[in-house]
């Protein structure tokens, strides 16, 4: 691929009829108004298709565009003829569109953020995926890899190009592995799904990116609705395969109207490309990373500059049931309340990419005091309506899988993870069990233990059992002063062991669910102060205290390299329940010995793949 000599912004072909009829609402629209609005109906919001040139002009900063020449591969490998020779169809498409193929590759910037983009054009044989398109998409990936620049794919396709036979099919694998190389290199990839995106494109590079953005009403799928209805006679629901349907079912991350695409994409690119720097570290207490109290750990102090209480004697000695009552108050700030006050450039990501978007779990990217972070948390609500809509803050298996997906993105991009926990526990019930609730929780525990980035967890309200722990395998585990954290709810424990749910206060005391007891036991590393009367009395003060605690914890962890972070985190949890010699420390975790060398040209990954295959 070579860059064209021109660096001028492509002229958008805004020529249109004086008046036209909207395909969405069938109303008459003044053509120039329609063009000025990005080809979006001002009456109903219907988004018309754009050419690749129009799309590039819409998205990239003026003066930043450098179109990359893409070589045209074998034009007609099968000498294919149906009602018309394929070679004739190619010539006609090139003449009518002015393009050599169904994709345009360019470098540029979006609100100052560098990006490599590949933009498909549906006018060219329905945006079908053939060898030339596959080569262009792969070439764009290779440019992004070589220049370590985020990749933006704008898709519009009816599927594979049948006239190229199995060669077209191979482009799915070719482009998929190119995306995989960007994953390995830690480079952000984003898809913008436009209408329509189907077949081989949908089942390869379009849906393999880190973030999937869709325009309103855009359709995405493997088999089209007509194919499904005709082959298996299945009745499909209204809105099937639209962006809105797919958002509800966890396939796309967000829907962005065309007028908001540039700021939406710029937020994503900005967070992903400006990595957090190191920060001054609070002097440690001399312990090594191996016991989970490495550099920057200040749990021996009563207070740090972050305001976190680390000495249980400085916390009020009260009955734990008081904390239970305060932790459950509906007025307490929720995860989204804290995010709204603390996180700049917030972009929420949706869905587990499988079937669901659990409303009880929120996750996304943003900045905390300028530091790019990933924030994940359970969300309850403040009213009965909100609680019901959010499943009472009890995540489904899909919620935990959504959290895991975003944690993996954090690991890929090298971003710290913050989790905010306020849940009575994982959602119980038939559907949760059918979908593998236990497996989802277990997989999160394993995943978090090995994340190569700083992880800070805060129990802000209720920390209920494994459903809370699935977000709390962290380098620093904090809790708010009036939060609780327990293996079971006090009422549940009372019902089982006391045979009387009314014995909840007794169970709370026996379980030691309060911050003072948990800090003394080392379950949490520090306690975030709350205003007198609770966080709901003065949410601003509670937010300020949480900000100080989070920024302090991240500053402590920022200088640590990935192996140290992982070793320290594993050591932290390794020591729980481990008998220690009198006056001595708990056993250090076992560090695997170096693997023996392999033959020339082979890697351990090759060996592992071979074992799995066998």
Swiss-Prot record:
The keyword Cytoplasm is assigned to this record: yes
Please state the residue ranges covered by C4-type zinc fingers: 22-44
Cofactor note, please? Answer: Binds 1 zinc ion per subunit.
Cofactor(s) named in the record: Zn(2+)
- Name the pathway it acts in: Lipid metabolism; malonyl-CoA biosynthesis; malonyl-CoA from acetyl-CoA: step 1/1
Chain coiled-coil ranges:
none
Q: What class of enzyme is it?
A: transferase
PROSITE patterns associated with the record: COA_CT_CTER, COA_CT_NTER
Quote the catalytic activity from the record.
N(6)-carboxybiotinyl-L-lysyl-[protein] + acetyl-CoA = N(6)-biotinyl-L-lysyl-[protein] + malonyl-CoA
One BP term from GO: fatty acid biosynthetic process
Q: Where in the cell is it found?
A: Cytoplasm
**Major site of localization recorded for this protein:** cytoplasm
EC number(s) stated in the UniProt entry for this protein: 2.1.3.15
Region (Acetyl-coenzyme A carboxylase carboxyl transferase subunit alpha) spans which residues?
251-614
The name this protein goes by in its record: Acetyl-coenzyme A carboxylase carboxyl transferase subunits beta/alpha
């Amino acid at each position: 691929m070579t860059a064209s000599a021109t660096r001028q912004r492509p002229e958008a072909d805004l020529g249109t009829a004086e008046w036209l009829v909207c395909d969405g609402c069938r109303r008459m629209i003044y053509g120039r108004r329609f063009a000025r609005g990005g080809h979006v109906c001002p009456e109903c919001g219907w988004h018309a298709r754009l050419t690749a040139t129009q799309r590039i002009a819409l998205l990239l900063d003026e003066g930043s565009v450098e179109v990359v020449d893409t070589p045209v591969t074998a034009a007609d490998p099968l000498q294919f003829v149906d009602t018309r020779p394929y070679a004739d169809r190619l010539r006609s498409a090139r003449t009518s569109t002015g393009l050599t193929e169904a994709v345009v590759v360019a470098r540029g910037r979006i609100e100052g953020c560098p990006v490599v983009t590949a933009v498909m054009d549906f006018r060219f044989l329905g945006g079908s995926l053939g060898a030339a398109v596959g080569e262009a998409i792969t070439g764009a990936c290779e440019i992004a890899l070589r220049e370590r620049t985020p990749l933006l794919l704008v898709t519009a396709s009816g599927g594979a190009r049948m006239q190229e036979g199995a060669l077209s099919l191979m482009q799915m694998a070719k482009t998929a592995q190119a995306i995989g190389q960007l994953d390995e290199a830690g480079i952000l990839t984003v898809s913008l799904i436009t209408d329509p995106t189907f077949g081989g494109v949908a089942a390869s590079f379009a849906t393999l990116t880190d973030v999937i953005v869709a325009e309103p009403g855009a359709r995405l799928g493997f088999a089209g609705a007509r194919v499904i209805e005709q082959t298996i006679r299945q009745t499909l629901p209204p809105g099937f395969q639209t962006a809105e349907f797919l958002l509800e079912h966890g396939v796309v991350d967000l829907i962005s109207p065309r007028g908001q695409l540039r700021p939406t994409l710029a937020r994503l690119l900005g967070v992903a490309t400006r990595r957090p720097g190191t920060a001054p570290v609070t002097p440690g207490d001399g312990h090594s990373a191996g016991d989970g109290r490495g550099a920057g750990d200040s749990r021996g102090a009563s207070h740090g500059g972050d305001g976190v209480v680390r000495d249980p004697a400085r916390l009020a000695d009260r009955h734990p049931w008081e904390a239970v009552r305060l932790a459950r108050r509906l007025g307490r700030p929720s995860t989204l309340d804290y995010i709204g006050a603390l996180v700049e450039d917030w972009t929420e990501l949706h869905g587990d990419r499988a079937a669901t978007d659990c409303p009880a779990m929120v996750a996304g990217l943003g900045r905390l005091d300028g530091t790019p972070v990933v924030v994940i948390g359970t969300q309850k609500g403040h009213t009965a309506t909100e609680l019901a809509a959010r499943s009472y803050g009890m995540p489904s298996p899909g919620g935990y899988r959504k959290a895991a997906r975003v944690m993996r993105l954090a690991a890929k991009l090298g971003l710290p993870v913050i989790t905010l926990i306020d849940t009575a526990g994982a959602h119980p019930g038939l559907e949760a069990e059918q979908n593998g609730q236990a497996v989802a929780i277990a997989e999160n525990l394993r995943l978090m233990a090995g994340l190569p980035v700083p992880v800070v967890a805060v129990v802000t309200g209720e920390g209920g059992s494994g459903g809370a722990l699935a977000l709390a395998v962290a380098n620093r585990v904090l809790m708010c002063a009036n939060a609780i954290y327990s293996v079971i709810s006090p009422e549940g424990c009372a019902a089982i062991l006391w045979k009387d749910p009314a014995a909840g206060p007794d169970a709370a005391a026996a379980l030691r669910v309060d911050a003072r007891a948990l800090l003394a036991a080392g379950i949490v590393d520090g306690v975030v102060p709350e205003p007198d009367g609770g966080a709901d009395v003065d949410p601003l003060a509670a937010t300020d205290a949480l900000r100080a605690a989070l920024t302090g914890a991240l500053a402590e962890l920022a200088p640590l390299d990935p192996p140290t972070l992982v070793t320290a985190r594993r050591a932290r949890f390794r020591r729980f329940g481990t008998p220690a010699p009198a006056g001595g420390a708990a056993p250090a975790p076992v560090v695997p010995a170096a693997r023996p060398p392999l033959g020339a040209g082979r890697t351990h990954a090759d060996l592992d793949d071979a074992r799995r295959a066998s």
